């Protein structure tokens, strides 16, 4: 993946998230440790370069653990450099719930999953939806997010009502 597109993603993301850190796989556990507020829940990461195994993150949380978690950790399926947006995929590990319930969301992004713009992202989505339908498997659903949850439904802008109040992105560059 071009370092230019990774830099563009990081710069765009920093306009709407609390932090965006670029690291190597060897730095993952210490970076995660610095960002996590316990108790923490997570969905198993499909990444080949990093894992939540051996961390304080519970990857098989109960409903109670999910409800009391301060931090949720998921991996983005696709990241869009143009806007600093990420997608949370619907996977068996409960990525959507883990990304929405805790007030702090840590998003792991493999640099190879960063695309330049929404057109490229939707081309990836189209392929994934087609594959899911052809194979009769879940995974076609995606949540597209740019920054923390914000709403002005009742007048004043409020953060964290319909999702996380804080978002921290960790980009893994191999």
Predicted regions and their residues:
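The feature marks the mature, well-folded catalytic cores of soluble enzymes
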Residues: 1-174
